[in-house]
Structure formats: structure tokens, C-alpha cells
Amino acid sequence: MDETDKEVDDSIHSNILYYENRELELLKNAMNIEAKKRGERIAQNPIMKQIINVLEKFIRDKKLVCYGGTAINNILPESEQFYKRNLEIPDYDFFSSNAINDAKELADIYFRQGFSDVEAKAGVHYGTYKVFVNFFQIADITQLDSKLFSSLKKNALLKDGMLYSPPNFLRMAMYLELSRPGGDITRWEKVFKRLNILNRHYPLKATNCDPETFKHSLSARSYNKQFQNEKEKIQTIIKNIASKEKLVFIGGYANILYSRYLHNNERAYLEEIPDFDLLSNTPDKTAKAIKESLEKQDIRNITIETKAAIPDYLSTHFEVRVGSQPVAYVYKPLACHSYNSIKVKGKIFRVATIDTMMSFYLLFLYADRPYYNPRRTLCLCEYLFKIQQKNRLKQTGLLRRFSITCYGKQKTIEDIRNEKAKQYKRLKTKKKSKEYHRWFLRYNPELNPENKPFIVQSKTREDIINEAKLALEAKILTSKAVIEGIDDIQKIDKLKKKNIVPTPSPMSPIRSRSSFSRVKTNKLNNRKNISARLSMRTPKTRKNKQVENLLFVEDNFTPSNM
């Protein structure tokens, strides 16, 4: 092949790639347009509006606390909101101190008001319960430690009668996500944008953070003669253990290292912090190692106290004291947290990234523990935030952000499913126990005897049509239904040869009842098959028979012409 032929081939190849890329752009554009239309159809559906109104009233009446993307969205000015209510249904996540009962109560409310296909069930994550109405997931209710729930409720933002998690807690959740490179990093861009918007409208501000005030506060809090006399020796011993065991500093010494990026007057405050906060995969052993090493250096009156966990947020941790003075807090990481390594006087130290430190400190604000001083902790957060903002593009040393090196075990979906499988084997003979329901709740309000008077409900034809439209949209939005629809299309030829009418695909027009009369096979069996395919629930879940009949009556009733 000469050079001319090669140039021609390259040109042809370039043209092919150009047209393929243009076609891909057209495809994406069409998908976006259809997704927008579909979202608007669902959001504007009168039945869906009723469903959301019932949910919001429930959240208000029960004084539950919203969190997550919808919470961030709803506390922002309308011009900055990233969810448009006329185009998307709000995806409410909220905390409860009694999540399983609240999920069942919400399901009962929907059932008693005549909504179809209502169910409450356990989510993938233990302690989270989902409520479904009309084939749509409407709410995620998450169990929260009672003290933490009370603290969030006390500090919550009230808007339109609904409680939203305080901005610092919402901020904490986003810093936590950005500090876990072993987690779902595909969400990082979205989370980062939302964090920046929240920081603009709800700045991280603290009061009375002058170094002199805090110097006195620290001294009054825990003055100990032995500690003051042997402070340097104690700190050197702990630093040596941390370096040797490759632990991660998340406070105390980490703050001192970060203080080099502050002004001199601010730096003086951070240098006065007397204790260490460490991440260790074996915190009990680390606490004992610190105690033994201190005792070898003739430091006496050392105690270790076990501190209770905050489920899903903070592990059981250990406080090491010299007399009355805490010298170290050792935590087991619940995820894989990012850190950077630096060399100081010939020793390698692992220091948490600012994102990791912020995720811990902002949680401490609401932990309601006497050993966390909220005012001092908030000041630390403000200083760290300032450092990060002033050095946001520097990616060296301690300032490297979004580090891929992390410490701890990150749970995967597979880990969670394996844990649920183990729990099922353990509890499968105790299906009526409370523990089984906490893990595997599947609540159908129709089976609740108290709901029997509400089973018969009269509905207008308009309500029936709107429910049918929602049912169709739900089928299309479900990936399983789409896959089944594709399988149906591929099987059409084979089914025609056998003179069997295929089950309607959720992607194809639904035919009238008369078109089924010509089928030689048993009509009753076909109808059972279709009903089963339209159902997204267990056989015991109530179906709206009027909706199912309508799906046979309406000709050419497809999502595209709703």
C-alpha cells in the first residue's frame, strides 16, 4: 500500500468516526429529551402529586429530619436548586429514631387512602426501609441513633414546616463521600458541585475562635501536672507508635502539621491541642500498645476507657488518659479514608486529608458526647476549610486532595449482600422475630387486619387513567422490565409460529381486549401472565383491577403519547 492509499484509508476512517460520534450525540440528545418529557409526565401526574403531598404531610406531622440531595436542594434559593419540581419527583430520604414502624405506618396511610401497590420493605443497607406506591419508590427512611437524631432535630432547619438536617451535617456527608476513594467515585463530581453550592449559601462559620480564648479553655478543661511535666515525652511516644504501626492522624498532631498554612496568630491556637486522634484497624490493640509504651517510660496512672459507637457513623473507640488528661483517641475506620504521607525528622507519618478530617469533625458537632467540645470543633473546621480554600489547586504534600490512597476497609455492595445472606441463614427459622423484620421487612398493608375496612375504594375514571399512566411509566423506568421487553421482541417470531400471543412488552403499545379474542390459547392463562408481568410486587400485594382492565381497553396507549 502506497502513501496515497494510506491517506485515503485514514480519511475514510476519520469520516466514519466523525459520523459515528455525531450519531452518538444525536442519540444522547434524543435520550435527554425523552427523559425530560418522561420526568415531566410523572411529576405532573395528579396521582403522583397526591402521593408526594401525603408523604410531605407525614414528614411534617412526625417531625422527621430530611437529609441527602433533596434536603440540600430544598434549603437552597430557588435559582440554585438542581432539582426542578415540575420536571422531577422529589426523592425524599429522612431520618427516624423508629424507622421500621414509620415505614409501616406510611404504607398504611397510603393504603387507607386508596393507593395501589403499596409496600414497605427493607433496603440493601441495614436500617434503611423503602416505601413503594403505584410501582414507584417514594421514600427512604433511615434508622438513626436516638441521641444523634435528637441532636439533628434540635439543630435542624425548618422550611415550609419540614425539618432539614443542619447544613454542617449535610456538609459532613459530602466530605465523607469525597474522602472515600474506595467508594462510588462516579458520584464525586455531582457531590463536589453540591458541596460548593452549599458552602456558598451556608458558609462554615464559627464564633470566638481567637487563640487566646482557646488556650485558656484547653487549660481549664484538663490541667494535669504529670502531663504538663512530661508532655513532650508522651507525645513523642504516641507519634512513634503511630509511625511504626502506620496509623492515620485525624486530629491533634494532624492539626499542628496543617497549621503551617495559617497565619501566625491562628497557628498558635492549633499548636496548643494536647491529644491525638488516630485511625487504627485494631484500635483496642493500639490503645494497649500506647499504655504499655508509656508505662515503660515511667509514666503512671494510665487508663483506657471504651467509648460507645454511633451506629453507621462512628465505631467503638478508645480513650487513653494520663491521670485526668486524655492523650489519645483511637478509632476504627468504618470506610477507607484518604490520607497523605509526609516525612518529619526521618519518620513517615500518615495524615488524613482535609476531607477526611472534616467528615469526622463535623460529625463530632452532633455526637452529644462530653469529650467533644462543639465550639472548639467548629473552630477547627473553619481553620481547615480556610486552608483548603486558599490552597485548593495545590496537589502536593498534605494539600493533595482526592488522594487515592486510603486506610480502612470499604464495604462493597457484595459485602453488604453477603452479610444479608448470612443473616438470612441465621434468622430464616425466626421469620416472626423483630430482628428478622429489621433485616428483611416486607410489609403489605393489605394483610394488616386493621386495614380491612379500607380495602374497597371507589375511584373516578380520571384517577384510574392517571394510575395506569404511572404504572406504565414505572414499567419503562425499571431496567428489568426493559430487558424483558427486549426479550419479548426477540421471541415474537417463535411465538407467532406456535400461535401464541406474546405478553405485551412495556415498550410496545398495549392492545385492546378484542385483539385477544382471536387467540386460540386459553385467554385466562394469558391474562394471568400479563397481570404477573405488570406486577412489580409479591402475589399478595393488592392490585388495582380497574387499572389492569383499563390497560386492555385503551388502544394505542403508549408513553410517547401521554
Predicted regions and their residues:
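Residue-level detection of beta-strand-connecting loop/turn positions
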Residues: V8-N15, F135, S324, G346
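Conserved catalytic core of two-metal-ion nucleotidyltransferases
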Residues: I109-S150, S293-S338
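N-terminal regions immediately upstream of nucleotidyltransferase
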Residues: M1-Q50, L158-E232, L470, A474-R511, ...
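Short, conserved charged micro-motifs
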Residues: I100-L106, D284-A289
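Hydrophobic, Leu/Ile/Phe/Ala-enriched alpha-helical segments that form helix-helix packing faces
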Residues: V54-I59, L106-G114, I237-A242, I290-D298
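Active-site nucleotide-donor binding segment shared across nucleotidyl transfer reactions
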Residues: M48-I100, K233-D284
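Active-site and adjacent loop segments of nucleotide-processing enzymes
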Residues: I59, I138-S222, P326-T478, G485-D488
